[in-house]
């Protein structure tokens, strides 16, 4: 259980760092928002696994300590999600904010805009047309990146669910084997096999995280 708790603490710290980056630059790229969303899902899944293990420990001082940790982590995850939603909502309004701030310089801005329009028109491409094309390109790139991040998130959720299923199956098998009188040596061999499956799971998860990181680095 301590290993899961330590892992959740690390995930929480990384998530806070990403949220701080988002807060420093409200108009953050969609790649950063996708990274935060994935980190939130990972933290919530880890908390669920930790909570499931705590529920199996019964009662006592040790169980109470871990239950308190689960509550603290759950509150942190909920607070992080609320903060992320607030920052994401704020990032949708940077253009309106900038327009209001630039109001006192309206005359100068109009003259500059007229000059830019004249220059672009002379080249055969009005300013608004160039902006529209640029926005379309950005929209297509963002949609592609969102699709990649969505696939990564779904893969992460599937892998976490498979890991939970393996844990439940292993626990049931051990209980059944002890009931049938199977020797501890045999149960240990089964346990080693389960550990190999866990190693495969975590290796796959690591590769997925690395892949998402490079996608964000390239497109973010």
Curated annotation (Swiss-Prot):
This protein's name: Protein transport protein BOS1
The keyword Hydrolase is assigned to this record: no
Coiled-coil parts of chain: none
Family assignment from sequence similarity: Belongs to the BOS1 family.
Cysteine-cysteine disulfides: none
Segments in the Vesicular topological domain: 220
Membrane topology value: Single-pass type IV membrane protein
Gene3D superfamilies: 1.20.5.110
Cytoplasmic side: 1-198
Subcellular location: Golgi apparatus membrane; Endoplasmic reticulum membrane
Gene Ontology annotations for the cellular component aspect, listed alphabetically: endoplasmic reticulum membrane; ER to Golgi transport vesicle membrane; Golgi apparatus; Golgi membrane; late endosome membrane; SNARE complex
Listed Pfam families: V-SNARE_C (PF12352)
Main location: Golgi
GO annotation, biological process: endoplasmic reticulum to Golgi vesicle-mediated transport; intracellular protein transport; vesicle fusion; vesicle fusion with Golgi apparatus
Name of the coding gene: BOS1
Residues that span the membrane, as ranges: 199-219
MF terms (GO), sorted A to Z: SNAP receptor activity; SNARE binding
Domain of life according to the entry: Eukaryota
Keyword terms, alphabetized: Endoplasmic reticulum, ER-Golgi transport, Golgi apparatus, Membrane, Protein transport, Transmembrane, Transmembrane helix, Transport
Function of the molecule: SNARE required for protein transport between the ER and the Golgi complex.
